[in-house]
């Protein structure tokens, strides 16, 4: 949509405002510059907004809704295939340039705001600032720094003899003083939220469900110091005990909560804690792995999804705010591909209605965007004109939001986003593992030749 000297733009179509209110079938949205000026029924549209001074855009069969919010991204991860690949490969300068490129992919997918849940180096905060001043196209970001981890956390999977990799998306903390120092340094780096690694991902056996990477005292230190500095606090917590400890400590946001139980739910409700389940990552692994993984890994992921389906459905029914997030940045969830899939999962597995799922990816998700959340996530006068126009009705078919070919417009701050797909980019040798074969080449006597196996 080209710029001209009109006063603003009036869009006519089905209006889904981001709340749980039923869509306005004959609706209109008016924006002037970067801000929404009016939203409502066509019959109530003030006369000036109908005139030629406002660009008139009729959108029959289309839905006009807030731009999506992805509540769990990793814009600096570059679609790494493993923790090792992320921690050990790719220079920081190249990672940064790649992050800027990938931010545009995210925006083109209808995601106008995002929460970056952990970064390598300090890429996310600096990219956020570069986008905000207009250097690169991308969503509005709220960001974490490198998440704080202990030896039992997600990121310290390397041998004790090995130095903690500087490229890892975490900082290793060993004492209360180191926790406080890490938080204060990240506050100095202008992060929006302090995130910790509250559990590992080694939930292969049931006994691992009772493991928390930090003590209750350490969790209190994190939540208290983050709050003192005006920052949010968040945790990666899959195990039951890591969820319970963070909830008792008063964290603002819990990622995953796969093994949440009734006690956890009660404390989350009491302390007004949000959950970002991020089931897209697990479901994609299950869908992709039958051809390339062992039974034990598949069983572990299936067990976690089953537990999450039961516990998180209860949490939703109890009224815990849930945010859609995808963990885009890892290879199972490439940028620009899966940002709307979590809504379908919420509907299919957690008992959400499509309208509730949309709300979780719009207005409810603003709760994790402390700096600008009250300016996005809802079609309302005074908020940013961050708008997605899609051919179809996501309240009837939530999957239409996964089909970028159905997007007529994505507006960010009233500016139409260029939706031209980006050309594919070659992966450099220094971005990936250096391996000879994807498996072991063993001699098979019955065949009289070598066979590649696991």
Model regions: which residues?
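Active-site mouth loops of central-metabolism enzymes
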Residues: 84-97, 158-181, 232
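Metal-associated gating/positioning segment near the N- to mid-region
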Residues: 62-130, 151-154, 217, 249
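Active-site metal-binding motif and surrounding structural segment of the metallo-beta-lactamase
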Residues: 44-65, 187
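Active-site core of metal-dependent hydrolases
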Residues: 198-310, 323, 328-330, 350-352, ...
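Short, acidic/polar
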Residues: 96-103, 174-185, 238-242
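Active-site microenvironment of metallo-dependent hydrolases
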Residues: 1-27, 32, 40-42, 100-101, ...
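Divalent metal-dependent hydrolysis catalytic cores, especially in the metallo-beta-lactamase
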Residues: 98-124, 137-147, 191-204, 232, ...
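His/Asp/Glu-enriched, well-ordered alpha-helical/loop segment
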Residues: 228, 306-393
